[in-house]
């Protein structure tokens, strides 16, 4: 990661075009056969995606195996941010289990920790966790998904700032933060909170149909297209993960 030029893979610049993913699939739940892991990653790649965020827990090892084989980059994410012995042990177990997977480009230590993400406690905890993580693996940047309060707390301390829904603070949010913290790399860990029903192009709330037109459904979120235009037009932003 480069704070001004984004992300580089094997020395070549690459814009991250990622997705957030829970570990479940229609019809089978979370206990997926290995072949379905391959199918999901191949399908995402066919859409043009090159990165996969494990939201919001460590994935099954078979998913990481598929990403290694097929060339999908990964954010590996711990379940709960914290500095207790139990929480640090969970982070350590994840990192020791997964660190030999070449697909992993970043460890995520948090997602939308609203109670602490915007204050000094969050910043101190981030530094403690980050320092601990680097005793296990120094080759990857630490990130966190942050949903606001980017001027304080976690966003002032983490290696790679993760913006969740920049509409919270206006489109100039990332530019302002980059000016104030020019040494921190950054990307969009969640953007584009759009709801759609496949093959449906009209709205019917009684049937819970939503038109498949990439329309923003929240006052706090852009459409995927709006979000991507922002992240793609700024060299310092490594890329974006669709929610």
Which sequence ranges carry the predicted segments?
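Short, hinge-like loop/turn segments at secondary-structure boundaries
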Residues: 70-73, 93-95, 158-162, 203-207
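Acidic-and-aromatic substrate-binding clefts and catalytic sites of carbohydrate-active enzymes
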Residues: 56-58, 81-87, 150-152, 164-172
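Catalytic metal-binding/acid-base residues of hydrolase active sites
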Residues: 79-80, 110-114, 138, 147-148, ...
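Substrate-binding clefts and catalytic carboxylate motifs of secreted carbohydrate-active enzymes
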Residues: 105-107, 124-135, 143, 154-155, ...
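Active-site-adjacent substrate/metal-binding segments within catalytic domains
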Residues: 1-131, 142-143
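Short, surface-exposed connector motifs at secondary-structure boundaries
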Residues: 42-51, 152-160, 211
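Aromatic- and acid-rich polysaccharide-binding/catalytic face
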Residues: 102-105, 111, 148-168
């Amino acid at each position: 990661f480069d704070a001004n030029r984004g992300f580089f893979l094997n020395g070549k610049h690459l814009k991250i075009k990622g997705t957030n993913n829970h570990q479940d699939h229609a019809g089978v739940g979370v206990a997926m056969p290995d072949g379905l892991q391959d199918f999901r990653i191949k399908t995402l790649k066919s859409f043009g995606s090159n990165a996969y965020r494990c939201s919001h827990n460590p994935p099954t090892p078979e998913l990481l195996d598929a990403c290694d084989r097929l060339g999908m980059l990964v954010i590996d994410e711990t379940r709960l941010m914290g500095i207790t012995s139990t929480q640090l042990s969970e982070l350590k177990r994840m990192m020791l289990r997964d660190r030999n997977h070449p697909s992993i480009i970043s460890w995520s230590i948090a997602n939308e920790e609203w109670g602490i993400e915007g204050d000094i406690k969050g910043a101190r905890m981030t530094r403690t966790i980050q320092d601990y993580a680097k005793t296990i693996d120094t080759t990857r940047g630490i990130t966190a998904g942050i949903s606001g309060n980017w001027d304080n707390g976690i966003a002032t301390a983490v290696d790679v700032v993760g913006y969740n829904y920049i509409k919270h603070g206006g489109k100039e949010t990332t530019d302002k933060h980059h000016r104030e913290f020019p040494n921190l790399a950054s990307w969009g860990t969640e953007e584009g909170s759009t709801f759609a029903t496949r093959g449906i192009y009209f709205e019917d709330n009684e049937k819970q149909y939503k038109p498949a037109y990439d329309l923003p459904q929240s006052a706090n979120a852009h459409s995927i297209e709006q979000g991507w235009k922002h992240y793609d037009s700024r060299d310092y932003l490594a890329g974006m993960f669709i929610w």
